């Protein structure tokens, strides 16, 4: 049985940025949540991602708390709440 490794969420985000800065890609998962509808709970697994530039707060509310990325398999820009990130490159994320 493989031993589970852990990483702090904000350390994972810094590592995502480092990987993205050199054109690399990473895998991660997060819990979906929509503040407007109050719905969520589904887990999204992104197998090939790269961070993209953050949208300013005046365009997207609370953007400082979101992770902006491109899903490379779907070639779509997406975002998620940073604190809802579950895994990064096989490591479990903790707060």
Regions found by a protein language model. Name each.
Residues 21-22, 62:
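Short, 15-30-residue, compositionally biased linear elements
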Residues 32-74:
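Short, conserved turn/kink motifs that form compact alpha/beta structural patches or helix kinks used as
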């Amino acid at each position: 049985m493989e031993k589970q490794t852990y990483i702090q969420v904000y350390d994972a985000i810094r590592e995502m940025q480092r990987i993205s800065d050199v054109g690399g890609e990473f895998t991660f998962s997060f819990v979906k949540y929509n503040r407007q509808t109050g719905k969520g709970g589904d887990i999204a697994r992104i197998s090939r991602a790269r961070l993209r530039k953050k949208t300013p707060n005046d365009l997207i509310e609370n953007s400082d708390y979101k992770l902006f990325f491109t899903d490379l398999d779907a070639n779509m820009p997406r975002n998620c709440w940073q604190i809802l990130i579950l895994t990064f490159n096989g490591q479990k994320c903790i707060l």
